[in-house]
Amino acid sequence: TGNAGPDLNGSQRAGDNLFTVSILALDTDTGEYRWHFQQVHHDIWDYDSPSPVVLFDVEKDGVMRKGLAEASKSGYLYILDRITGEPLIGIPEVPVPQEPGQATAATQPIPVGDSMVPHFIDAAPEGFTLVNDGKTYTPFGKEGALYKPLAGVNWPPKSYDPETGLLYVCANDRIGGAAQEREASPPTHTETWLG
């Protein structure tokens, strides 16, 4: 699913913003809700996942599992059991820095293992100061901040090779920067938010 709006200003939408930036499973026969997994709580970085998930079958602990993989703009790869929504690899909730003016979430689900892209900035670009080493989920206020990645995995779809068991992903290694809107008007039920 997409992110909540306004996407760079979380001050008006406290909480995790349930079902945004999520993988949502519905029963194909009835349309009934099955499960969901939220990839980013209270997204202020535009870290939704615009490309489709990849479905695959894999043996784990001697049992064949029906897997689902989603590579996100956050630069993380979420691997879930597509029947239950449970992670096939660990995805602990990790404490992250806070920005009270953005009502940021206290934790984010971060998959264990190697990342697809760097999640910190080695050195500040000229004229900029780094906050929190520019790490992923660095919150920003009205003064702004740099963070990495910017659109770690964007629109290009992923591909899985069942012969090799490899997932192929087109990823970006770019620095992002944002500042909270100074005067945000409350959204109305008739507005469309694009991000």
Give residue spans per PLM region.
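Beta-sheet-rich non-transmembrane sensory/scaffold domains
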Residues: 1-195
